[in-house]
């Protein structure tokens, strides 16, 4: 299986005020591949990632998953569920009144897991990141790095087929950023997901299978 991006164009506005943000983007990401998107601010990275996640529609072009359009005419996933696309953002966005384990179990239950299945899965993921002793604490009791690790495991809770990460390490120091990206890469490889991450940090490029450079809405050679 692969995610195939074919000639994606995105314009904002109309007429004289029209801005061309993406100008014919083409690339492919295979199952189990971890790809980094890089480029200056305004190059179109976040717009592209937002389109891939179904949060924004393209002006023209097609995104294919498993040889079929990723989204139907109503902009709903056509060959997978919404839960099959996982998002990781720069900020953790944890729910302040939920304990750490609840941040994950509620996601699992909303996706159809039983309470027991969800709990088992959440505990295992939290063990993977060394937070098994923090299951019953609240977000305000966690460090910034711990919050981001919980948010990452929350994105992996439903075994998504596609992971989209937008600057998940931007607020972290170099050591924590490295650990976070190692964690993301490990999950993508172990569960054979399609992974795409935006980052400006060139120190993290070595963890990607491939780096795609964007400039002025186009992929550079």
Swiss-Prot record:
UniProt cross-references to SMART domains, sorted A to Z: AAA (SM00382)
Residues the entry annotates as binding ATP: 39-46
EC number, as in UniProt: 7.6.2.-
Cellular component annotations (GO), alphabetically ordered: plasma membrane
Molecular function terms, GO-annotated: ATP binding; ATP hydrolysis activity; transmembrane transporter activity
Predominant location category: membrane
Domain ABC transporter positions: 3-221
Keywords: ATP-binding, Cell membrane, Membrane, Nucleotide-binding, Translocase, Transport
Membrane topology, as annotated: Peripheral membrane protein
EC class: translocase
Cell compartments where the protein resides: Cell membrane
InterPro entries: AAA+_ATPase, ABC_transporter-like_ATP-bd, ABC_transpr_LolD-like, MacB-like_ATP-bd, P-loop_NTPase
CDD domains: ABC_MJ0796_LolCDE_FtsE (cd03255)
Induction: Highly induced by hemin.
Family stated for the protein in its record: Belongs to the ABC transporter superfamily. HrtA family.
Assembly and binders: The complex is composed of two ATP-binding proteins (HrtA), two transmembrane proteins (HrtB) and a solute-binding protein.
PANTHER family in UniProt: HEMIN IMPORT ATP-BINDING PROTEIN HRTA-RELATED, IMPORT ATP-BINDING PROTEIN
Function according to Swiss-Prot or TrEMBL: Part of the ABC transporter complex hrt involved in hemin import. Responsible for energy coupling to the transport system.
Annotated protein name in UniProt: Putative hemin import ATP-binding protein HrtA
